[in-house]
Amino acid sequence: MKCSLRLFEKAGRLSVRSQTVQTFQQRIVLANGASYLVNTTLPKPYILSIKDITNMPLNNPKVNALSSIRGQESRRSKFEERYEGL
């Protein structure tokens, strides 16, 4: 917990205002099971990351989700062949 004092002037007199920021350690768990700690102001102890670099199909080409992208490439090539001369 960090605590700092800040002086500010209000109606011609100085006052002391305390500004308190509480930080918590948070564990972020990636899709592949790896985790790391981050200091944050969110009081949640952990976050399960749904989308990260370990489960995105473009970053991890071994994932089966790329089959739909390959299917779109073949559809696009058929479309380009059909309307090539226009």
Swiss-Prot record:
Subcellular location: Mitochondrion
Alphabetical keyword list: Mitochondrion, Ribonucleoprotein, Ribosomal protein, Transit peptide
InterPro entries: Ribosomal_bL31m
GO cellular component, one term: mitochondrial large ribosomal subunit
Entry's Gene Ontology molecular function annotations: structural constituent of ribosome
Gene Ontology process terms (BP): mitochondrial translation
Principal location listed in the UniProt entry: mitochondrion
Keyword Signal on entry: no
The organelle targeting sequence, given as a residue range: 1-18
Signals that turn on the gene: Differentially expressed during meiosis.
UniProt key word Metal-binding: no
Family classification: Belongs to the bacterial ribosomal protein bL31 family. Highly divergent.
Annotated function: Component of the mitochondrial ribosome (mitoribosome), a dedicated translation machinery responsible for the synthesis of mitochondrial genome-encoded proteins, including at least some of the essential transmembrane subunits of the mitochondrial respiratory chain. The mitoribosomes are attached to the mitochondrial inner membrane and translation products are cotranslationally integrated into the membrane.
Subunit structure: Component of the mitochondrial large ribosomal subunit (mt-LSU). Mature yeast 74S mitochondrial ribosomes consist of a small (37S) and a large (54S) subunit. The 37S small subunit contains a 15S ribosomal RNA (15S mt-rRNA) and at least 32 different proteins. The 54S large subunit contains a 21S rRNA (21S mt-rRNA) and at least 45 different proteins.
Protein name: Large ribosomal subunit protein bL31m
Gene: tam9
